């Protein structure tokens, strides 16, 4: 929150990457996943802040129930349980999807900061990898816990939140580079205009008249 407010204060005077919202974990898990591990990953996000979002999409009521029970069990011994429980109660969600396509549609619509595919290697996991494309970072496999990306594996930790992954990626040097463009026109050796310039003049003139900007059209000619 403090970093976000600092960015708001300097925005317009200095370049920033993005205004980040609460941290997000979005997990797609099937019956091959360990409910205890899935619950641990959800709580790892929930303990950050009461506004943190932990979402699980799975495919059976039985697995959803197992994860829910594990969350309650782990909260009992979690030192940060007060914050984590408020986060789970406020923003935690377990969704039962009827198919991989539905699960991917939900994920792409959410465009989460962190997307985990807690599934065995195989056709279903490959299919989800192909269907999902809106996320900050993708974590593939049962052992690919989001915390490894944050702390140890070297992945980008400054990622888009609040749906921004639909149109941008994580922080990179490119965000602090400035792009400028240049237009130069030249004549042929006989003093005539090059064909490209002629076409540009005609196009600009037509658009100027179409928009009712006569001076623009005249300037083109």
Model-derived features with residue positions:
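Structural signal for hydrophobic packing residues in well-ordered secondary-structure cores
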Residues: 6-14, 33, 46-50, 67-79, ...
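Conserved NAD(P)+-binding/catalytic subdomain of aldehyde/semialdehyde dehydrogenases
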Residues: 1-53
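C-terminal segments
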Residues: 130-221
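Short, glycine-/Ser/Thr-/acidic-enriched flexible segments
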Residues: 1-2, 32-34, 61-62, 100-102, ...
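Electropositive phosphate-/nucleotide-binding environments in soluble metabolic enzymes
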Residues: 19, 32, 36-40, 57, ...
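A glycine- and small/hydrophobic-rich beta-loop-beta segment
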Residues: 48, 52, 56-135
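Structural motif
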Residues: 1, 17, 24-27, 53-55, ...
């Amino acid at each position: 929150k403090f970093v976000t407010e600092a960015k708001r204060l300097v925005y317009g005077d200095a370049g920033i990457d993005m205004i980040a919202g609460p941290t997000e974990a979005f997990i797609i898990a099937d019956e091959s996943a360990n409910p205890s591990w899935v619950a641990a990953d959800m709580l790892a996000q929930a303990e950050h802040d009461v506004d943190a979002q932990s979402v699980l999409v799975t495919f059976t009521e039985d697995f959803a129930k197992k994860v829910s029970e594990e969350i309650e069990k782990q909260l009992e011994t979690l030192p940060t349980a007060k914050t984590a429980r408020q986060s789970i109660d406020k923003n935690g969600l377990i969704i039962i999807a009827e198919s991989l396509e539905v699960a991917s549609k939900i994920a792409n619509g959410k465009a989460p900061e962190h997307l985990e595919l807690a599934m065995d290697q195989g056709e279903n996991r490959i299919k989800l990898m192909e269907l999902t494309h809106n996320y900050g970072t993708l974590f593939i496999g049962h052992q690919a816990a989001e915390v490894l990306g944050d702390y140890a594996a070297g992945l980008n930790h400054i990622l888009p939140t609040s749906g921004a992954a639909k149109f941008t990626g994580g922080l990179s040097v490119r965000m602090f580079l400035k792009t400028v463009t240049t237009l130069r026109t030249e004549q042929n050796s006989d003093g005539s205009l090059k064909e490209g310039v002629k076409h540009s003049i005609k196009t600009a003139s037509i658009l100027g008249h179409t928009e009712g900007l006569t001076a623009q059209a005249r300037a083109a000619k």
